[in-house]
């Protein structure tokens, strides 16, 4: 089954699915990260004018999340749907502000990450692992 999941996440398959959403009349499409900004730009093109938002997927480190969002926005994405990366964050307010800076104010991921480190310094940018920050045991 792992191979089937990987096949569905392949850039060509994701692009085809975005195009299908556009052809079926979607008002907006939430899509997975295809690997880099150029591939995301091809998704924007495939969407034929339908706005794209970046899905969060697995819990990411802060720097990686902000970097993906910077690349997606530069490629024509309009926002993100990254709930897990916000509500599991040690400072949901700070990561939301950092994402807003990148998306709405066109800050670089590095600049937003620096501000995030100042606002929520403990472990800023560390890769995910263990229990969600700020929780004791299972949620």
Language model regions located:
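Flexible loop/turn segments at secondary-structure boundaries
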Residues: 60-61, 87-89
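C-terminal helical cap(s) of enzyme catalytic domains, especially alpha/beta-barrels
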Residues: 73-76, 88-127, 133-137
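Short acidic/histidine-rich active-site segments
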Residues: 80-87
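Short strand-loop junctions, especially beta-strand C-caps/beta-turns
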Residues: 55-58, 85
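Alpha/beta enzyme core
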Residues: 1-53, 60-78, 101, 107-111, ...
């Amino acid at each position: 089954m792992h191979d089937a999941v990987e096949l569905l996440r392949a850039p060509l398959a994701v692009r085809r699915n975005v195009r299908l959403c556009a052809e079926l009349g979607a008002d907006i499409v939430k899509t997975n990260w295809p690997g880099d900004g150029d591939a995301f730009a091809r998704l924007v093109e495939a969407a034929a004018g339908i706005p794209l938002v970046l899905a969060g997927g697995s819990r990411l480190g802060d720097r990686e999340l902000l970097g993906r969002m910077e690349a997606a926005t530069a490629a024509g994405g309009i926002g993100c749907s990254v709930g897990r990366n916000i509500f599991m964050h040690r400072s949901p307010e700070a990561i939301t502000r950092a994402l807003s800076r990148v998306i709405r104010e066109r800050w670089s991921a590095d600049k937003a990450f620096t501000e995030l480190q100042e606002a929520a310094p403990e472990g800023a940018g560390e890769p995910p692992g263990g229990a969600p920050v700020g929780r004791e045991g299972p949620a």
